């Protein structure tokens, strides 16, 4: 049974990876002849009356759900780019030596029968 499951996973996983990669290319196509492997009609479902300013500044990831949720998480979604690009520099120079270092060799046992 384990062999059957392993063979099944080894056959399905590459197909799923290629399907998810192809899904990124077919999103939001406007052409009339857009049928190919993995293509589906994309419908935005949002409430009426929202302006462009009220829309979320995220990548549309609901297509990835249709394609087994593989690739949309590769594209990191951040709301504020300035916060995401902030890098804190730390001082890598140590000003003091480590005080816990004991450079001596370990002592030999003082008992005759354990030596």
Curated annotation (Swiss-Prot):
<feature type="compositionally biased region" description="Polar residues">
    <location>
        <begin position="93"/>
        <end position="102"/>
    </location>
</feature>
<keyword id="KW-0862">Zinc</keyword>
<keyword id="KW-0732">Signal</keyword>
<feature type="region of interest" description="Disordered">
    <location>
        <begin position="93"/>
        <end position="115"/>
    </location>
</feature>
<keyword id="KW-0574">Periplasm</keyword>
<feature type="signal peptide">
    <location>
        <begin position="1"/>
        <end position="20"/>
    </location>
</feature>
<keyword id="KW-0105">Cadmium resistance</keyword>
<keyword id="KW-0614">Plasmid</keyword>
<keyword id="KW-0170">Cobalt</keyword>
<dbReference type="InterPro" id="IPR055013">
    <property type="entry name" value="CzcI"/>
</dbReference>
<dbReference type="GO" id="GO:0042597">
    <property type="term" value="C:periplasmic space"/>
</dbReference>
<protein>
    <recommendedName>
        <fullName>Cobalt-zinc-cadmium resistance protein CzcI</fullName>
    </recommendedName>
</protein>
<dbReference type="GO" id="GO:0046686">
    <property type="term" value="P:response to cadmium ion"/>
</dbReference>
<comment type="function">
    <text>Component of the czc cation-efflux system that confers resistance to cobalt, zinc and cadmium. May have a regulatory function.</text>
</comment>
